[in-house]
Amino acid sequence: MSEKYVVTWDMLQIHARKLASRLMPSEQWKGIIAVSRGGLVPGALLARELGIRHVDTVCISSYDHDNQRELKVLKRAEGDGEGFIVIDDLVDTGGTAVAIREMYPKAHFVTIFAKPAGRPLVDDYVIDIPQDTWIEQPWDMGVVFVPPISGR
């Protein structure tokens, strides 16, 4: 990936609230299935905004920090997804999204970010990201002291 897109906590919350507003009325949803790990924080934000208490996970591994690798389902939520929102942080090449669609064909699949290759596989998203851009999520970064340029 040649470019990086850094997401702050504030940006993430703003984007999640925008997505939540599109998912109203909240009474239409039985619950949320968050794709672990990228969808965990966005899933918590959606659950808060929509007042949803039923939150489950589907645990899929497809990345090793910044390298995509073979897809592995570690745990899945039961059912076909009817009445559920499935949330992930982003859709990239579409590998995870295809697996989600197969597991939960009746779910409403949403992400915060979408890259061109995976965009057709989600029902809704908030931000377009170029395909060759790596997204640095706030939960993957730490806040550190940066000394002044002058050194004083």
Swiss-Prot record:
Guanine binds at residues 92, 135. This is Xanthine-guanine phosphoribosyltransferase. GO terms for biological process: GMP salvage; IMP salvage; purine ribonucleoside salvage; XMP salvage. Xanthine binds at residues 92, 135. One of its GO terms (molecular function) is magnesium ion binding. Purine salvage pathway enzyme that catalyzes the transfer of the ribosyl-5-phosphate group from 5-phospho-alpha-D-ribose 1-diphosphate (PRPP) to the N9 position of the 6-oxopurines guanine and xanthine to form the corresponding ribonucleotides GMP (guanosine 5'-monophosphate) and XMP (xanthosine 5'-monophosphate), with the release of PPi. To a lesser extent, also acts on hypoxanthine. Its EC number is 2.4.2.-, 2.4.2.22. Mg(2+) binds at residue 89. The keyword ATP-binding does not apply. HAMAP family: XGPRT (MF_01903). Its cofactor is Mg(2+). The gene is gpt. Belongs to the purine/pyrimidine phosphoribosyltransferase family. XGPT subfamily. GMP binds at residues 69, 92-96, 134-135. Coiled coil: none annotated. Homotetramer. GO terms for cellular component: cytosol; plasma membrane. 5-phospho-alpha-D-ribose 1-diphosphate binds at residues 37-38, 69, 88-96. SUPFAM superfamilies: PRTase-like. Its main location: membrane. Keywords: Cell inner membrane, Cell membrane, Glycosyltransferase, Magnesium, Membrane, Metal-binding, Purine salvage, Transferase. It is a peripheral membrane protein.
